A protein has these predicted regions:
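C-terminal and inter-domain tail/linker signature
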Residues: 1-125
Length: 125
């Protein structure tokens, strides 16, 4: 499946080869903000930070058709359990051109937003 390399990177928390998986102008749609992030540099920071925040991350289902894939995951942030989906769209070059993440329940999303905000603020000085 096209999404296997991404799945392996996410499950192993190894995003060192993000540039080999995503297009340079990838569009990332976060569950926390409406405006998408654009570009590989932003994506590297976000994926690296979320990999630090999520505990017990695992994919529990995967569906692919044509140029799209949906990966269903479960994770934990502290005592908050959450479920989510990564929706990937592949470009003609086979690289991921767009990624959209959705998370439930709201308490899990709120925990993610809070912890991501804290870590990103600390990283930017």
């Amino acid at each position: 499946m096209k999404s296997d390399a991404f799945r392996h990177a996410a499950e192993s928390k190894d995003f060192s080869k993000v540039g080999e998986l995503f297009s340079e102008d990838v569009v990332f749609r976060s569950p926390a903000v409406f405006q998408p992030y654009t570009g590989l540099d932003s994506l590297k920071v976000l994926l690296g930070t979320v990999a630090e925040v999520f505990e017990d991350f695992r994919y529990v289902d995967q569906v692919e058709t044509g140029d799209s894939a949906v990966l269903v995951f479960e994770a934990r942030i502290g005592e908050r359990e959450l479920h989510g989906v990564d929706v990937l769209r592949f470009g003609e070059d086979g690289l991921i051109a767009e990624m959209m993440v959705m998370i439930r329940p709201l308490s899990g999303l709120n925990a993610l937003v809070e912890e991501m905000g804290r870590r990103l603020a600390a990283a930017s000085g």
